[in-house]
Amino acid sequence: MTENTKDTPESETGWRCAVCGFLFSGERPPRSCPRCGSPGAEFLPAGDHTVFRYDGEPFDVLLINGSSHRVGNTGFMLDCAAEELNARGVSFRRYNLSEYSIEHCWCCYSVKAEYCTYPCRNWQDDMPGFHALLATAKAVIVASPINWNNMPGRLKDFLDRTTCMQNLFHLDKPGLTEGKVVGILVCGHEDGALKTALDIFLYFQQMGYILAPFGIGYRTHGAEFNSSTDSGFFRNDQRVREDIKGVVSNVVEFMQLDIESQLKGRLAPVSE
């Protein structure tokens, strides 16, 4: 049962808010979501969900937007990152986690280490596709907002689900991510940026990723301002663009050293 219960004429389309799931019928999305207030750009055509799987085409850098909002400030940071990658001729793929179905980790490891297998036992959602992307990409750049001095729950679910990749050495299998490069971008209204970045990095560190030199970029606005002004601040602040360009450049330079190949088979995995 949808919340917009009027009959849908043939000329109208169903739209779903990617943030809260509100369903709307009309020729175009509403200007803002009646339930969560998100702008109309957050709406996607409604329809049956197709399980996401990696198509196997090679690429270099994986861009992950961990925010609930596809087109908010975190999305803007990835816009800037994508712009720099394009300028450098580096292939990449970009994903907004809010568009995908990623369930909570089942915590099989807590029952017995060997029960946490790869591929993941939960193959019914979209995460197996992301596991394959992580195994393929030479580098990852994660962009995150700040929620209560930490990453949002959506991103944490995504990172929790990488446990099966970190756990490969318990199964006497070779790692798939050791020596890859990671960069982290964080934005928020107030404080908690560096803590958020380090919390994110901890997951990647345990998978064998190497943080690019100067690989963390962050910016906050300020508690004295209304959060409605954050968008204009980030988009008009030259420092934001320069820092993102720097992080992306550092990730690419480090990635192109091909340290992953140099370290292959030489690292000793250590559990957290």
Where are these predicted regions, by residue range?
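N-terminal beta1-alpha1-beta2 submodule of the flavodoxin-like/Rossmannoid cofactor-binding fold
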Residues: 2-3, 21-22, 35-37, 45-172, ...
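Short metal-coordination and nucleic-acid-contact micro-motifs, chiefly zinc-binding Cys/His arrays
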Residues: 11-13, 29, 98-101, 178
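The −1 position to Zn-ligating cysteines in a subset of zinc-ribbon hairpins
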Residues: 16, 32, 104
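Short Cys/His-rich zinc-binding micro-motifs
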Residues: 17-26
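Cysteine-rich micro-motifs
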Residues: 28-39
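Mobile beta-alpha loop/short-helix "lid" or hinge segments that flank ligand
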Residues: 97-103, 174-176, 207-230
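Short, glycine-/small-residue-rich phosphate/pyrophosphate-handling segment
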Residues: 171-217
